[in-house]
Amino acid sequence: MISSNDFRTGTTIELDGAVWRVVEFLHVKPGKGSAFVRTKLKAVQSGNVVEKTFRAGEMLPQAILEKATLQHTYMEGEDYVFMDMGTYEETRLSAKQIGESRKYLKEGMEVNVVSWNDKPLEVELPNSVVLEIKETDPGVKGDTATGGTKPAILETGAQVMVPLFLSIGEKIKVDTRNDTYLGRENS
């Protein structure tokens, strides 16, 4: 059990048979009446976001999530197959469960798979990944790092804005949290 006073961004709770993650919270103490906590919750399974208000100090069941590092091995139809490299046990997740993470997911990549009650819920990518540029306008001599940007499509199909001097075939580091270019990858 967790008190609503202890909510932090990222805290997970069980509510109505589902797992919810606290996205935003605000402790409110009005001049008249009792204090309360206004929250914005995101359903881990579906991604739905709701606003909910709890009394200050209200006790709620905390969802205990388990994380396992698994390797993305292959796709079978619409399912992504992950393998525990220690036990060789396979875990399957649907494209819906993967969500936006699929635009950076490539075979052989190690990710954290989050489970609740032995059911996989979602995939947590590393903060940055190295991917190859597959499509972009050609780089022209004289383009500088301080100049503008252009769109580039990466090997996984993700699109990010990159500096003008980059060209097809180069490997770049991308931040998976906000889809931004971090730099060239020397390999």
UniProtKB/Swiss-Prot annotation:
GO molecular function, one term: translation elongation factor activity
SMART domains: EFP, Elong-fact-P_C
Keyword Protein biosynthesis in annotation: yes
CDD domains: S1_EF-P_repeat_1, S1_EF-P_repeat_2
GO biological process: peptide biosynthetic process
Subcellular location: Cytoplasm
GO cellular component: a single term: cytoplasm
Superkingdom field: Bacteria
Pathway: Protein biosynthesis; polypeptide chain elongation
Entry annotated with the keyword Protein biosynthesis: yes
Keywords: Cytoplasm, Elongation factor, Protein biosynthesis
Family: Belongs to the elongation factor P family.
Function: Involved in peptide bond synthesis. Stimulates efficient translation and peptide-bond synthesis on native or reconstituted 70S ribosomes in vitro. Probably functions indirectly by altering the affinity of the ribosome for aminoacyl-tRNA, thus increasing their reactivity as acceptors for peptidyl transferase.
PANTHER family, A to Z: ELONGATION FACTOR P, ELONGATION FACTOR P (EF-P) FAMILY PROTEIN
Name used for this protein in its record: Elongation factor P
Organism, scientific name: Synechococcus sp. (strain WH7803)
